[in-house]
Swiss-Prot record:
Liver, gonads, head kidney, heart and spleen. The lineage of its organism: Eukaryota, Metazoa, Chordata, Craniata, Vertebrata. Oligomer of 24 subunits. There are at least two types of subunits. The functional molecule forms a roughly spherical shell with a diameter of 12 nm and contains a central cavity into which the insoluble mineral iron core is deposited. Fe cation 2 binds at residues 59, 104, 138. This is Ferritin, heavy subunit.
Amino acid sequence: MTSQVRQNFHQDCEAAINRQINLELYASYVYLSMAYYFDRDDQALHNFAKFFKNQSHEEREHAEKLMKVQNQRGGRIFLQDVKKPEKDEWGSGVEALESSLQLEKSVNQSLLDLHKVCSEHNDPHMCDFIETHYLDEQVKSIKELGDWVTNLRRMGAPQNGMAEYLFDKHTLGKEST
């Protein structure tokens, strides 16, 4: 059944939004895996766990926001299977942050691709939505993760376990307060 509210909403934009929803849910799933990995007794980096759990929640919210706009525009949501994370063991904190950085960069590229599709189909509403709610936040997140990886490497991580312990306690501990 065709939506009565659909206006200036190309099928390519609708399909690209559905792909982005799936990617955001995948990112949420990856971060959830990371969170509970660092919560294990043999890792015990509780602020890493808390950070990744918050990231998981944020990515799920991104997916839900896209679902809401899909409905508002008269599109249809077609959920796909969410791929399992690439790994079950995330290694050290710095290795997990490097994986997180790569994930955020791929999410950002996908958002840029979505923006391009919407722009090519003259959909200023969707372009504005992506710019307002996603792109700036992605750039800030990528910068923060890059800075953290640099600082952890500077302190000798992952070979120096004290570096990750102090980072967990002082840097990520401040993030969660």
